[in-house]
Amino acid sequence: MKPLTILAGFAAALVLALPASAADKAKEQAEIQKAARESLDKFYKKKPAIEGEVKAAPGYAIFRTYGLSFVVGGSGGGGLARDPQARKDTYMKMAQASAGLQAGAGEKDLLVIFKSKAAYDNFVQKGWEFGGAGSVSAGVAGKTAGGGSGQQEISDATTYTLTRNGLDVGGALQGTKFWKDKDLN
């Protein structure tokens, strides 16, 4: 009788935990949606032409990342990829590793605007990995300065990075990976 009691208790705990898990999932999705709206507004304010690019694109992705570096660095974050025609969001994660002459900590927003539906679909279905880009940037409180305009061209996509409250200085080789968030989709 004791194993049956233990099994019943485990089943009851599992059933009670499921609604909380669904509520947590919905809460996290809502937080990502809010962060995405805030980030887009900041990109639009910084460079108004981006709004037209986003509206004309077959898809885009927006991420908020947090990182720390001193010679070796890393950052990670989450966000979403949006298909505006299907009105569908796919929740995604991002991780970045770097090595080189660098020091800093901060929060950044990353916007990827896809030039083709195929590039967007490939990003969502297979993720993305790329690396080898040098970076030199400095920014405080949402302002970017340094090596370039904060815009970078990748095959069939344009990316924009907005430094929110951090300072990154150096020439670092970075590898970045994007993938679907299996818990939020």
Model segments located where?
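Hydrophobic core
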Residues: 10-16
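Small-residue-enriched, tightly packed secondary-structure blocks
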Residues: 23-185
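Sec/Tat signal peptide C-region and signal peptidase I cleavage site
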Residues: 16-23
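Bacterial N-terminal signal peptides that target proteins for export
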Residues: 1-10
